Amino acid sequence: MSDTLIQFGHSFQKKIIVLLLYNRRFLQTISDIILPEYFDSDADKWLVRSIKKYYEKYKVEPTLDALKIQIDDISSEILKKLVVDNLREAFQHREATDLEFVEEKVLEFCKNQNLKSAIMESVDMLERHDYDGIKNVIDVAM
């Protein structure tokens, strides 16, 4: 299993972004476990990071106006253009018929990544005989 979403393809990642922007229930469910590092492009990483930060602060998904203001603050013109292009591409998937499937798959992927990280963290704890710590880390990951 790959540590990134590249295995699912380019358009799949764009559908995740559109879900983060338009499906509050999905954003609430996945915001704690989805990481920008799972995405291929720097532009997608920037979008996911920005959506998560906005959600953490305001408890709602960002509006297009809010995103535009954040995009305008990007210092790199290349990244700014890529973010705008990727956002446009993501919006083309707003009405995709497989968004529920994408939700299920990305949630499963993120949960598995979270569990994988917890297991790796548990190895060090096992060497220290910290069994309560291991149980706690695994419980949190589940």
Predicted segments with their positions:
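Interdomain "pre-motor" coupling segment immediately N-terminal to P-loop NTPase/helicase cores
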Residues: 91-142
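Noncatalytic partner-interaction/assembly domains of nucleic-acid and motor enzyme complexes
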Residues: 1-109
